[in-house]
Amino acid sequence: MTERISLTRYLVEQQRVHGRIPPQLRLLVEVVARACKRISFAVNKGDLGDVMGTAGTENVQGEVQKKLDIIANEVLIEANEWGGHLAAMASEEMDGIYVVPNRFPQGEHLLMFDPLDGSSNIDVNVSIGTIFSVLHKHHDDPTTDEPVTEADFLQPGHQQVAAGYCIYGPQTTLVLTVGDGVAMFTLDREQGSFVLTRENIRIPEDTKEFAINMSNMRHWDAPVRRYIDECLQGKEGPRGKDFNMRWIASMVADVHRILMRGGIFMYPWDKREPNKPGKLRLMYEANPMGWLVEQAGGAATNGRQRILDIQPAQLHERVSVILGSKNEVDRVTSYHSGI
């Protein structure tokens, strides 16, 4: 019988053998995983748990909040504020940062999260998920005792120390990187623990699948239109092969599919809001997903620049996102460069 390795054991071995995970970071990841279990149970209850529908409020982006958005946000805050592993948190669902109250010890890390990505799919029972990203506080001066401010969160994605997501679908699956490849853990509901089910996940460099919202085609910039036009021409076109389109309208679900079998995900800038660089959030979605994809051998850009090299100017900054199989992402990027 194959030996079952729990998330806790995996993290301990990463800490002991590779020295990659200090104790506070290990605790943080375990607490986030426990919070995701609670969110999973709430999602699974659906109409039986009075968690469906809208909450009658809007988040900082002006989006109508679902009841589960608020529940998931509260679960993550309550689980992480008291353990001594965090200094502050930031969420897509909150205007500003949440500093750990003085009655609790403060830790060395900052946690950012999208508590429930794809929440527009909640009421139709499509896979949704939690995305998270971890940074060191006071990255430029770790010895300072200055209070944490919003500016401490404004670090480029390549300074992340852990990132991952938990997808709530037919299985509840946690996908994680600490900078040494990508590992996947599946929730064993009978045991109540996440168990390692895949390690060293790799994204194929080439693909025949793309994920994009085709209804917005008339609003895209020329390089994106060119790329999709060539895909649609199939074997008779310049690509010489047929492509399939996939679009779930849940980033966590689309990226999970790409990690499992390859593909390219695109949520590009469009002409309807020319002053905005994109739709997805750099800090809560693009950075953690971009790092996971890169750690699995893929690539992630905004069309012109590597996602992880973008210096954020604000907490809720938006960005155009193109990520997935490396050769396809490189092709789209070259079209933006006029190559």
Swiss-Prot record:
UniProt-listed GO biological process terms: fructose 1,6-bisphosphate metabolic process; fructose 6-phosphate metabolic process; fructose metabolic process; gluconeogenesis; sucrose biosynthetic process
Residue numbers binding Mg(2+) 1: E92, D114, L116
Annotated GO CC locations: cytosol
Pathway: Carbohydrate biosynthesis; gluconeogenesis
Any matching Pfam family: FBPase_C
Catalytic activity of the protein: beta-D-fructose 1,6-bisphosphate + H2O = beta-D-fructose 6-phosphate + phosphate
Subcellular compartments: Cytoplasm
Residues binding substrate: D117, G118, S119, S120, N213, K279
Names of required cofactors: Mg(2+)
Cytoplasm among keywords: yes
Cofactor note: Binds 2 magnesium ions per subunit.
Enzyme Commission number(s) from the entry: 3.1.3.11
Matches recorded under NCBIfam families: PRK09293.1-1, PRK09293.1-3, PRK09293.1-4
SUBUNIT field: Homotetramer.
Record-given protein name: Fructose-1,6-bisphosphatase class 1
Origin organism lineage: Bacteria, Pseudomonadati, Pseudomonadota, Betaproteobacteria, Burkholderiales
